[in-house]
Amino acid sequence: MVPKHTIYCLGEVLLALDADAPLAHAESFRPRLGGDAAVLAQACAAQGGRASLLAQLGEDPFGHRAASTLAAAGVDTAHMRFSRTLPTALLFEAGGEALSYRVRTAGLQFAPEQLEPGLFQPGDALLFASSGLCDSPLRYTHLAALTAARDAGALTCFAPCLEPALWPQPEGESTPREVTRQLLPRADIVLLTTEELEFLFGTAEMRVALFPLLRGHTQLVLLARAEGIHAFTRTNHAFWPGLSLPAPRLAAKALCCLLQKNSTPEKLPRLTTRQLQTIL
């Protein structure tokens, strides 16, 4: 059953170019769609969800290629913006080496005033990751979207999908760890891996990290670990032993299920262990 509500995926969309040879010697590249928002939106659409992308691309061939790819994957691109003055971001990758061109690009310059008023409706969801939280207008668009979604009664979900290498680090700028930790308590649902847990809190011990995680607005935490996937509310716990899912697919699967059940921020604290066990 396809949920009647929309999962809005906010963040960055870029064109990734992969090479087999080291970047300094590469003569050809394979293009693919990249960026957290694009990956999350595609994962939601693949789960049968109604996924809509909130992002800005350049009014250029790369931007239109990305939009066409997303539309072909079943993602609603009607709310995307296109800039005539800023290009689509590019990411070159080869054998673990990455070189990004993103600082003065359309994606990171997606500003709060470009969000449509009244976009979110009760029963919708806002899903976002961390790469768009570096110091840019896009960071403040995330804050504005979180406020708008909460005011509308929509669920909010933060799946950081941390890639610190993608964060420019000018002197004096907040680090990925600091900004991510600041945003965690503003989301109703948080999804982390063991590696992210250790990066953010200095420990892989989930019982220790749960105390700083289950605070603020956060009512549900999903942890993807080697032994399986855990779900925690402030009172209950569910576990799927041996289950392994990439973070975007895990977030998409959980959100699609919660929307099918007409979950709201107010209902999350009341989820029983049996109900939790049905979200994956």
Task: Go through each PLM region and give its residues.
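Conserved phosphate-binding/catalytic region of the ribokinase-like
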Residues: V2-Y8, T147-D151, A204-L280
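Conserved beta-alpha-beta core of the PfkB/ribokinase-like small-molecule kinase fold
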Residues: S130-F211, G228-I229
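Conserved N-terminal subdomain of the carbohydrate kinase-like
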Residues: R50-S130
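Short secondary-structure boundary/capping elements
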Residues: R32-V39, G107-P112, G172-T175
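General beta-strand structural signal in soluble alpha/beta enzymes
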Residues: C9-L10, H79, C157-F158, L191-L192, ...
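Structural motif
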Residues: T6-Y8, L15, D124-A125, I189, ...
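A short, aliphatic-rich alpha-helical micro-motif
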Residues: L119-Q121, L183-L184, R215
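Glycine-rich phosphate/adenosyl-contacting loop at the front of the ribokinase-like
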Residues: M1-V75, L276-L280
